[in-house]
Regions:
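Bacterial Sec-dependent N-terminal signal peptides
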Residues: 1-25
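Mature catalytic domains of secreted/periplasmic carbohydrate-active enzymes
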Residues: 21-227
Length: 227
């Protein structure tokens, strides 16, 4: 198959940080900053001194690359599933073609070091919900593609070996999860479904923090969503 890489570099970005919490009966939503004022801790000071960084978006959306049935759609390619012209079932089947056999995380990391990057942020999953690590909480992952290998682990290991701090991007929107709601739940059924999504999200975050202990932080996306 034709292999595509959709790589976006974003410099001097600010991440949001997260820590795994112990078990709890319910998971109340909390939005906004958890601290008041400027942080002065060592981790934040290290971040402020990083300067140049690398932000990589990669997923099954690299296969259409912004094109569908011969038409080019302007805008970010990772949003193509939300466009009316592309059937969702067609997009959700793209993972069956995802087989980047030429992917070389060590080469990426080496090039990043050569260009002077001190940190990188990598998409573990975007809004489509496809996971580039073999999450045990969903089948919509790299493990069920022809490629099968854990992309996140390769990235974390390669960049860490080059002395580059790794932060993991995580979308709090997940179009693939049945419990996700784009707006506040209006019915009891919606509330129950959304509670399963919150638990799913928490489990995946703990999974990432547990399986990739070398990472320096998490970058959350999707906080504009009304849910």
């Amino acid at each position: 198959m034709k292999k595509c890489f959709y790589i976006l570099f974003l410099f001097l970005s600010m991440p949001l940080w997260a820590q795994a919490q112990t078990r709890r009966a319910s998971i109340p939503l909390q939005h906004g900053a958890h601290r008041i004022g400027n942080r002065t801790d060592a981790d934040m000071e290290r971040w402020r001194q990083h300067g140049l960084g690398q932000f990589i978006h990669w997923g099954v959306y690299a296969i259409p690359g912004g094109f569908w049935e011969g038409k080019c759609y302007p805008g970010a390619a990772e949003w193509i599933r939300s466009w009316k012209e592309m059937p969702k079932d067609a997009y959700d089947s793209l993972y069956k073609q995802f087989n980047p056999t030429s992917f070389d995380a060590k080469a990426w990391a080496k090039q990043a070091r050569q260009m002077g990057a001190n940190y990188m942020i990598f998409t573990t999953k975007h809004h489509d919900g496809f996971c580039l690590w073999p999450s045990k909480y969903t089948d919509y992952t790299i493990a069920h593609t022809p490629y099968k290998k854990d992309v996140v682990k390769q990235i974390v290991d390669a960049y860490t070996a080059e002395g580059i701090d790794v932060h993991l991007y995580f979308s709090i929107i997940d179009w693939n999860h049945k419990g996700y709601r784009p707006a506040p739940p209006e019915t009891r059924q919606d509330s129950i479904a959304y509670e399963t999504f919150k638990e799913f999200t928490r489990n995946q975050l703990i999974e990432l923090l547990t399986d990739y202990p070398a990472i320096k932080g998490l970058w959350f996306d999707g906080s504009w969503d009304k849910a």
